[in-house]
């Protein structure tokens, strides 16, 4: 069946001919029309090339989303995400749509990791599908850019077992890092932060995520500053 997104977008444009459409409804139509869904999962639909976006509005601010969509390689020179050369109105609409995504697209009581009994495997699925991997990398390798932080990078988590006890790690995940330490105290706030996962994940889910991180034991990993 052909996607209805172009028809939805055409209807919105016709109804708002005096001004380009904005808001989450228009943003969802743009998101589909320009091909974002071919690489990104939202709920159970979409591709798996890029990060799952079901919780992206919880993980990132609208300000950062706008900067990222405007020019992905200006933020991360090695990203594979293309610059779609969107108009300001289309970008604004997509940002409003993404900023509203806070887990509601998962069916009630059904998350991707439900039914996985092994805590480490379950934690790995949470790490991937909740979006931790988008900032901390596959296997907790780190290296993702952030502004005005030490080294200009988000910390690796692959050495978490050398840095945290499990209770410490659970507490860290639960409260997040809403205000990362600035490299330059007089400079701007870092735009990428760790949200308080206790707001959207249960204690059991956070425990499983911690079990996964503590299972990672890289050779020669340095001390984390996370």
Regions found by a protein language model. Name each.
Residues 15-32, 102-128, 143, 222-226:
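Electrostatic cytochrome c docking/interface patches
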Residues 76, 167, 178-186:
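Substrate-binding/catalytic groove segments of enzymes
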Residues 64, 84-110, 195-226:
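C-terminal capping alpha-helices of c-type cytochrome domains
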Residues 36, 132:
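Short cysteine-rich clusters marking metal-coordination/redox-active sites
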Residues 24-30, 37-70, 74, 82, ...:
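Gly/Gly-Pro-rich "capping" loops immediately C-terminal to redox-active cysteine motifs
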Residues 29, 63, 67, 92, ...:
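Solvent-exposed, polar/charged alpha-helical surfaces in well-ordered, non-transmembrane soluble domains
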Residues 1-29, 88-89, 98, 215-226:
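N-terminal export/targeting leaders of redox proteins
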Residues 40, 98-102, 136, 174-177, ...:
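Protein kinase-like catalytic domain
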């Amino acid at each position: 069946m052909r996607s209805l997104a172009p028809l939805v977008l055409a209807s919105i444009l016709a109804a708002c001919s005096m001004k380009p459409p904005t808001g989450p409804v228009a943003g969802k139509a743009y998101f589909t029309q320009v091909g974002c869904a071919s690489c990104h999962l939202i709920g159970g639909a979409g591709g798996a090339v890029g990060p799952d976006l079901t919780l992206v509005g919880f993980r990132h601010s609208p300000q950062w989303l706008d900067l990222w969509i405007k020019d992905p390689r200006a933020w991360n020179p090695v990203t594979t995400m293309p610059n779609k050369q969107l108009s300001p109105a289309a970008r604004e609409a997509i940002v409003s749509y993404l900023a509203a995504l806070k887990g509601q697209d998962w069916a009630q009581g059904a998350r991707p990791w439900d039914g996985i009994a092994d805590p480490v495997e379950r934690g790995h699925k949470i790490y991937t599908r909740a979006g931790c991997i988008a900032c901390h990398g596959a296997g907790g390798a780190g290296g993702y850019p952030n502004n005005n932080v030490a080294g200009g990078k988000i910390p690796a988590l692959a050495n978490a077992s050398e840095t945290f006890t499990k209770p410490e790690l659970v507490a860290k995940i639960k409260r997040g890092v809403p205000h990362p330490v600035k490299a330059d105290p007089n400079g701007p706030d870092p735009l990428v932060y760790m949200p308080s996962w206790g707001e959207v994940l249960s204690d059991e889910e956070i425990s499983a995520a911690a079990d996964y991180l503590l299972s990672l034991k890289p050779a020669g990993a340095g001390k984390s500053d996370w």
